[in-house]
From Swiss-Prot:
The lineage of its organism: Bacteria, Bacillati, Bacillota, Bacilli, Bacillales. Pathway: Glycan biosynthesis; glycogen biosynthesis. PROSITE patterns: ADP_GLC_PYROPHOSPH_1, ADP_GLC_PYROPHOSPH_2. Involved in the biosynthesis of ADP-glucose, a building block required for the elongation reactions to produce glycogen. Catalyzes the reaction between ATP and alpha-D-glucose 1-phosphate (G1P) to produce pyrophosphate and ADP-Glc. One of its GO terms (molecular function) is ATP binding. This is Glucose-1-phosphate adenylyltransferase. PANTHER family: GLUCOSE-1-PHOSPHATE ADENYLYLTRANSFERASE, GLUCOSE-1-PHOSPHATE ADENYLYLTRANSFERASE-RELATED. Alpha-D-glucose 1-phosphate binds at Y101, G166, E181, K182, S192.
Amino acid sequence: MAQKQKCVAMLLAGGKGSRLSALTKNLAKPAVPFGGKYRIIDFTLSNCANSGIETVGILTQYQPLELHNYIGIGNAWDLDRVNGGVTVLPPYAESSGVKWYTGTASAIYQNLNYLSQYEPEYVLILSGDHIYKMDYSKMLDYHIEKEADVSISVIEVPWDEASRFGIMNTNEEMEVVEFEEKPQFPRSNLASMGIYIFNWAILKEYLEMDARNPESSNDFGKDVLPLLLDEGKKLMAYPFEGYWKDVGTVKSLWEANMDLLRDETSLNLNDRNWRIYSVNPNEPPQYIAEKAKVEESLINEGCVIEGDVKHSVLFQGVTVEEGSMVIDSVVMPGAKIGKNVVIERAIVGSEMVIEDGTIIRPEKNVDDVVLIAEGK
């Protein structure tokens, strides 16, 4: 019998991330490298660890192998616990056959037995594909104080981007009065961050109700939350004012990496009070050659720099040979950049080999970002 837990987190990490093109051809979106040494999922798992959430179910589906290997037993995030800790929850076969996760609500519904063993009071539902730092314990306190059935973390987005998100319309007390999924003409710019806290009894009841509805797409935003509102349940919006980035496109992933290089970034990776943990690559120290030049860049272990690197993010094991320039770019693990290469405003995928004399930069629109990755 598992030990009772006040709050259990369920981390949705099965997304394909098709807008990231070749970067997710053989890799789940939460496993995509970010920030020179991390994977995207590191931020959510580190938030759980730093918030005192010690029981985390990770729901995987698309290209799960590398993600499973990376997570392991959760020791990198201090989540390798005897009671609770990290549990990877892929779809599984029953007597009726394999049940794939058909939506966010479907994924949680199929793992109600996992949740039930902990008899939680609250369930925290998270997405594994956003970049942010957040104390979930403060959101839980807010949820309890407001006596909510469900609390939804929201952030103000630019009005011209609001139609890309699930939008909350609230009253003065921040109680949600209407939820619109990607509205054409939004009446609010409070966007859902895909972070929910449910009272366990409410979650179980409404997921079972949703599963019985043959017309449902089994999605929290499209189906479950509107149903809760229709039935008069209390949904509270929890305002978040820190850094938050949906890195669902090549350009947004590049932008988030570039944000780390600002003199005053709101995403501080050097915050000793809120560390972002990752799996140690166990590479040797970086080597910067005598004639090399490095400015405003993040250079991870195992890199050999003989050329020039400016305002860029280089992951472990990257080689930049003599005469080459890397500017405003992200170079992922193990990439080899030959001699006299120019790379500007680009993402270079893992293990890519860039031949001598190659020039990579946007051809038409200078604001574009070039992706060079296997399968592109």
